[in-house]
Amino acid sequence: MAKMIVFNEEARRALEKGVNTLAEAVRVTLGPKGRNVVLEKKFGSPLITNDGVTIAKEIELENPIENMGAQLVKEVATKTNDVAGDGTTTATILAQAIIREGMKNVAAGANPMVLKRGIEKAVEKAVAEIKAIAKPVESKEAIAQVAAISAGDATIGNLIAEAMEKVGKDGVITVEESKGFTTDLEVVEGMNFDRGYISPYMITDPDKMEAVLNDPYILITDKKISSVKDILPVLERVVQSGKQMVIIAEDVEGEALATLVVNKLRGTFTCVAVKAPGFGDRRKAMLEDIAILTGGRVVSEEVGIKLDSATIDMLGRARQVRIKKEETIIVDGAGRADDIKARIAQIRRQHEESTSEFDKEKLQERLAKLAGGVAVIQVGAATETELKDKKLRIEDALNATRAAVEEGIVPGGGTALVSIQKALDNVETPAGDEATGVAIIRRALEEPLRQIANNAGYEGSVVVEKVKSLPVGQGFNAATEVYEDMIAAGIVDPAKVTRSALQNAASIAAMLLTTEAIVADKPEKKDAPAMSPGMGGMDMGM
């Protein structure tokens, strides 16, 4: 296919046009008085959202060169979302501002490579300053504030803070769609996995269709149990102790299953069999997790323990095990705290070293199950359109909160970026284009605050100048339209979100400024469809 090649100023201007088209669609959503954007869906109702990355992902432009510019800014939003989970609109606005100011200077004769060096030095200094002014997030109130600002809803903020309090900062918090109108929090305490009882005859509570065993012994094995002979020695010891028993195995079938069911129905002995969770190597790892949590051992021939030689000392213990049709919950396992901590540290290391997103997600789940349970936020709304928007907002708020716990918080509402401008005075650069690069970042740092003010119906430049004259930490509260201490007012941003937005925006913008030629596919001219015979003058007897 033939290519078109565009050079110099013409190339940069076309890219900038694409950048501006995407950024203008996204920037209207910033701040407490930001508007929504409606996205057409080929199937189902349109999606109404104010989530920057969701809007950016939908945008494809007709002109191939302008589309390249839009795709580059889309990468800014996507990368920021991947790293920090929020701040995508801020990142897009920063990228647009850096590109706009940079283009002016390149057009006036500045050397793009020297400008890029100045931009990089300024960003390095700004990031160090963001880290320096960040305050750690420890209290439930601070967590609620971060989540409320991100979601634009105090109720959601409180819900996320409550979820984090219950499952811990490493705990898994999932967001699911509910059938009702209200948004609720459901906490599953202890370790849970998605396998239930093998036979419904094993239930102890017919009303709830579940088996609840208090203070049971837990046999954990990766073997398939078909013959009762294999487990008879350990079964006899458990029966003598008068306790109940849970068997977690690859499967329990045939004679072994029949024996357990008959004894349960006769009231002789309660034993519930559950299939082991996961598959392959992940199953072995999860069984090991359960063993450490309950203070037992995995009975496996791989470690030299045969099923018929298992002793009662190898069994795990827990305060309670609840088993439903498709879920098992182990509450308060009897494992040693030091062993559990060591296992958590090991999984955390694996999580850091893993390059697969799927593996990371599964390791995070295992981490949470060992660390303290799973919280589920059930999102409810009157219509499907509202439900989708609400779910996106809650997911954003959850990501922002995790980022805040990780690296702390800074004053929100674009205030932190304006306040770190002063730090750029200390960047050592030779006069000329490198100093201009620093000035470009200094000017771009004002842009998010300017846009928040514009969206609230104020003159952005006036608000920016006013905030610059205020003490550090004070800014413009667009929700109440007053100037106040942002952290005291609960208007905060996660430092990680602010840092990632600036770094990603500057990275893509600097690359774009140094572009001197663009190669793109030539759009194909589509021939007009041939008219069908007899349609010429539309006479045909009419």
Swiss-Prot record:
Gene from which the chain derives: groEL
Reactions listed under catalytic activity: ATP + H2O + a folded polypeptide = ADP + phosphate + an unfolded polypeptide
Record flagged with keyword Zinc: no
Pfam families found in the cross-reference section: Cpn60_TCP1
PANTHER family (UniProt xref): 60 KDA HEAT SHOCK PROTEIN, MITOCHONDRIAL
Keywords: ATP-binding, Chaperone, Cytoplasm, Isomerase, Nucleotide-binding
Protein name: Chaperonin GroEL
Major location category of this protein: cytoplasm
Species of origin: Heliobacterium modesticaldum (strain ATCC 51547 / Ice1)
The family this protein is said to belong to: Belongs to the chaperonin (HSP60) family.
Gene3D superfamilies on file: GroEL, GroEL-like equatorial domain, TCP-1-like chaperonin intermediate domain
Chain residues that bind ATP: 29-32, 86-90, 413, 477-479, 493
UniProt subcellular location: Cytoplasm
UniProt entry tagged with the keyword Nuclease: no
Lineage: Bacteria, Bacillati, Bacillota, Clostridia, Eubacteriales
Assembly notes: Forms a cylinder of 14 subunits composed of two heptameric rings stacked back-to-back. Interacts with the co-chaperonin GroES.
GO MF terms held by the record: ATP binding; ATP-dependent protein folding chaperone; isomerase activity; unfolded protein binding
Signal peptide: none
E.C. code: 5.6.1.7
Listed GO biological process terms: protein refolding
